[in-house]
Amino acid sequence: TENLYIEGDNLDVLKLLQESYLGKVKMIYIDPPYNTGNDFIYKDDFTQSASEYAEDRGSFDDEGNRMFKNTDTNGRFHSDWCSMIYSRLLLSRNLLTDDGVIFISIDENEVNTLKTICDEVFGESNFIAELIWSAGRKNDSKYISVSHEYILCYFKNAQYIKEHQIIWREKKQGLDNIYA
């Protein structure tokens, strides 16, 4: 197989890959920003201040009164992140073969939001599993140590997998003798 290394903004690269790799990629693994606000070399904090969010979304009526009260639970913490991940997942889906699969790493901050977006992009019926893996423990947590992360798995087309009887697991030798 040929290897390809492309450096650039991932959205631009995904758009570029559409030309040559549309429907040709068997498996994709992505590890997107977790929206934690930590100091990484890439943007990992997609929150806006309450005033920025209110201004952008037209959250005041004609008299200048706020149209919602609880600024800590509104979309300003997720809207930009959702827009960022949604567009990239759509482009990634286009690259997958009909029997292709995507794995997406995430932590507890956005796993539920990501699942909702993936259900829309890939379809709920194409959901395979939510894998939970044990991460390293530093034993420096203030209250409780979160020691796992998630990997969401989706088929591009589960119906294609069924119709073509594609097997992900094979029976182990001797298993029939045990259960006979």
PLM-predicted stretches and their roles:
Residues T1-A180:
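Core catalytic lobe of class I
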